Amino acid sequence: MYMYVNPNYVLVGGPCCGPCGGCGPCGGCGPCCGGCGPCCGPCGGCGPCCGGTSSFCGCGPCC
């Protein structure tokens, strides 16, 4: 499983994620955050602010 530690990562909760994810200011996702911001896809995939490789989906369970 691909893991990326964002310096702005919040371990529990956050302004746009559920209890098993966390968000940075760019909408970065935790492992089971389901699509919470401009950098996230519907399966918890993340864009560049979460260490991903595309603007829509770079890391997450179904990317």
Swiss-Prot record:
Coiled coil: none
Keywords: Developmental protein, Differentiation, Repeat, Spermatogenesis
The protein's name in its UniProt record: Male-specific sperm protein Mst84Da
Family stated for the protein in its record: Belongs to the MST(3)CGP family.
InterPro entries: MSSP
Gene Ontology annotations of biological process type: sperm axoneme assembly; spermatogenesis
Tissue specificity field: Testis.
Domain writeup: This protein is mostly composed of repetitive C-G-P motifs.
Record Pfam families: MSSP (PF03940)
Keyword Repeat among UniProt keywords: yes
Lineage of the species this protein comes from: Eukaryota, Metazoa, Ecdysozoa, Arthropoda, Hexapoda
